[in-house]
Regions:
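N-terminal membrane-targeting hydrophobic helices
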Residues: 1-247
Length: 247
């Protein structure tokens, strides 16, 4: 999927299934986005390693643990800016922390398997010629649209739509006061995402330059991956600002 935050759509049905109820949802989500987070920090070689099962353990797993620690330290602050419940997943229980580690790996596995079918360097894309069939010819600089690329964008649209549906279902069950508060926080979050995208656009545009012009696929990749760092930073700053303002 070209959009990292569409990946958690896969883990929600898993968590709600008969066999996945005991898994930790925050860890599933963190693991589900972890292989792409290294792209957001410019660590492209490490990110490529994180898209393989063995490589994930020494690249993606440390990122997951860092994210969980950030949530552990800022869980109270983040509640003021996020339109959904924020829970601290870390505990003193060895059993529960073991479940967290397993959930991180399962979440990452869903990401790695999906990307195997939807990326040019994916294992299944290389193995199945049908995924390499070009559906749109004539684009310059080798920017053809193949089956795997269509699956990328279709997966993003369906995944994002599913997450929006789950959020709407969550909202309907809340009292009116909480609904209004969550709506305000959601609008602020969207504004921060737009701000992050605007800050990233000049950098992505420069990195996507080629001798023949702008490489569209490369621009989309840099824009969607690098904007996550700006967005995450803005969210943390907004959370800290809300806490300071209320003191």
């Amino acid at each position: 999927m070209p959009w990292t935050f569409a990946h958690p759509a896969i883990v929600f049905p898993l968590k709600q299934s008969r066999y996945g109820r005991w898994l930790n949802l925050p860890a599933l989500i963190t693991g589900g986005v972890s292989p792409d987070l290294l792209y957001s920090s410019g660590m492209y070689r490490a990110a490529d390693e994180a898209h393989h099962f063995t490589g994930w353990f020494y690249t993606g797993l440390p990122v997951c643990l860092a994210v969980l620690l950030i949530f552990h330290w800022l869980s109270v602050s983040l509640k003021t800016v996020l339109p959904f419940p924020v829970t601290d997943p870390l505990t003193c229980s060895l059993r529960k922390n073991s479940v967290i580690l397993l959930s991180l790996f399962i979440g990452a596995a869903t990401h790695i398997i999906w990307d195997a079918f939807t990326h040019e360097t994916g294992t299944m894309v290389r193995a199945l010629s049908v995924l390499q069939v070009s559906l749109l010819q004539g684009m310059t600089d080798g920017q053809e649209i193949a089956v795997y690329k269509v699956l990328q964008h279709l997966g993003s649209l369906l995944g994002t739509g599913y997450l929006c549906l789950k959020f709407a279902q969550y909202q309907r069950a809340l009292p009116e006061a909480e609904k209004r508060g969550n709506l305000i926080r959601l609008i602020r979050l969207i504004a921060l995402a737009v701000l992050g995208a605007l800050c990233t656009a000049p950098l992505a545009y420069g990195l996507a330059q080629t001798e023949t012009g702008v490489h569209i696929n490369r621009f989309v990749f840099y824009e969607l991956s690098l904007s996550i760092s700006f967005f995450a930073g803005f969210v943390v700053l907004a959370a800290l600002f809300q806490v300071i303002r209320k003191r």
